Curated annotation (Swiss-Prot):
SUPFAM superfamilies per the UniProt record, alphabetical: S15/NS1 RNA-binding domain
Keywords, in A-Z order: Ribonucleoprotein, Ribosomal protein, RNA-binding, rRNA-binding
PROSITE patterns assigned to the protein according to its UniProt record, in alphabetical order: RIBOSOMAL_S15 (PS00362)
Sequence similarity: Belongs to the universal ribosomal protein uS15 family.
Name assigned to this protein: Small ribosomal subunit protein uS15
Organism: Nostoc sp. (strain PCC 7120 / SAG 25.82 / UTEX 2576)
Signal sequence region: none
An example Gene Ontology molecular-function term: structural constituent of ribosome
Record has Ribonucleoprotein as a keyword: yes
Alphabetical list of HAMAP family matching this protein: Ribosomal_uS15_B
Gene name tied to this protein: rpsO
Pfam families tied to this protein: Ribosomal_S15
Quaternary structure (record): Part of the 30S ribosomal subunit. Forms a bridge to the 50S subunit in the 70S ribosome, contacting the 23S rRNA.
Amino acid sequence: MALTQQRKQEIINNYQVHGTDTGSTDVQIAMLTERINRLSEHLQANKKDHSSRRGLLKLIGHRKRLLAYLQQESREKYQALIGRLGIRG
């Protein structure tokens, strides 16, 4: 379920703002989205895994707060990011 180092690096390369960026809001949201997608697949196969479901809800809440921050800071970056990630309609 955990992301491999190679997959993390791919996400960072795709969403980084500048060459050494590893912790910007865009990268954090992209990482959380990948983890949420993997955990959702796991929960579809393992419906009774309630501890993982709780973890999923925590990740969704964290991503929601980061998205709210990004929307407040830069509406254009927010719209572009949710379009690239395919979240929120």
